[in-house]
Every structure is written in structure tokens, then in C-alpha cells.
């Protein structure tokens, strides 16, 4: 007879309890990339997946030829409203940024940052983290994707950022 493992009632209750915690945090419904969106897709594929996505009139430019040329409707995560921007390079989606201003939040976004870090731990495992007096950062790697959450706590420019980006491995000779 094959060795079939049947979940016990206690293990099912643990799974249900864990899933009940997630909606309570307010952070878990929108961190994943939108349905149908994946890094490496073209702008036409992005438009097909997100028909409401709009071209940005003044695209943000980042190093590596990244151009933040598309945006989607704001989404609420962890008590803040995040604006998603889609960055392309070489005709491929390479980066998705969710950015929320947090100047009006009494904690400058620290609570939202903490909720997003908890979400990241649940999805990706332990993070690589750093903290200094003006910011906090937590990062994970999942396959060919780097994911990070950053909080800037300066009251004049407080913000929280969640970023998905295509992983770029460098050869030591390139450094």
C-alpha cells in the first residue's frame, strides 16, 4: 500500500488560522504582481493583462535603460495607497514599483513597512535587511526576481516602496 499522508485536523486548523491572519494585516491582497503580469513581458502584453494601464506622459528614467513608461490604478496595501509604475528596457518589463507617500502617516509608514516585511517573510522566507536612521530596507530573491521593500522616514519625503525587478547577475570581471 502506498504511503499516503492524510492531514490531521490540527494541521488543517493551523493552515486556516494562518490564512485568517493574512487578511487582518491589510497587506496581503496586493503585493503580488497583478494577475497576468510577469517580468519579461512586452508593453502590448501588459496592456492586454491590464487594459486600464496608461502610458506615463513624463516617464521616469533609471539606470540600465529602465523607463517607467506605464502606470496602473493605485492600490491599497497595509493602510497606504500605492501607485504602481511599470519600467521597461529593451522592450521588456523589467521592474514594477509600488510607491506610497507616507508624510501624513503618524509613523511615516513604519507600520506599513512592517506589514510588508511580514508578508515577504511569509512568501519568500527570511529577508536580507538593513536599517539606518533615515530608512529601512528588506530584500528577497525568488528565482529570477529580486523583491524589496523600502521605507524612507524623513518627515518631508516619507514613503514606502515595494519593488519587483528582474534579477541581474554580474560576472566578477564586469565589476
Please identify what each model-predicted range represents.
Residues 5-8, 23-25, 32:
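A general, composition-driven signal for non-globular sequence regions
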Residues 15-16, 79, 125:
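Glycine-centered flexibility motif
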